Amino acid sequence: TKSLQYQEAANWVGVLFAVQAIGSVLWAICIPMFKDRRFIYALSLVLGGIGFISTYFVHSPYVLFVSFLLIGCAWAAMLALPFTILTNALSGGHMGTYLGLFNGTICIPQIVAAALGGSILALFTPEGMLPPEINMLVTAGVMLIIGAACVYLIKETKGERA
């Protein structure tokens, strides 16, 4: 952690996270222009999935700007749209309970991934080699695309079009 390469990589990650944040803000401005919430949410997830998967193929640090801009699109949509879509799919009673359970479906996978992700990645790594973390990014991209398809399983009952 004291090597020059490590410090340069850490600095570059900070730049990429800033690019992701900029992409998120710009996409958040665009989201209200779309009337169909499920469509824009699914599109955002697909764009984020493409961003994550593209990191596998990109070998130029500056081209990663495009990848992280796309990841920012998914991030912007994930902050608000799932709860809006869910509340529109529920009728009044027990809404707090459902929202709490829904929040658990977000938090529990994050905790499991943080606790076990490295171990799972190591299972697919040859003995004596470092695990290829890029596989986790590709997996994240695939999961976002699967999630985009699942968006259409939810039927909003009120306010279908904003």
Residue ranges and their predicted role:
Residues 10, 90-102:
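Loop-to-transmembrane helix entry/capping segments in MFS-fold secondary transporters
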Residues 25-38, 121:
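Helix-to-loop junctions at the C-terminal end of transmembrane segments
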Residues 47-59:
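C-terminal ends and interior cores of transmembrane alpha-helices
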Residues 63-78:
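Hydrophobic core of transmembrane alpha-helices in multi-pass small-molecule transporters
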Residues 77-91:
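Intracellular juxtamembrane helix-capping segments at the cytosolic ends
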Residues 136-162:
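Multi-pass alpha-helical transporter architecture, strongest
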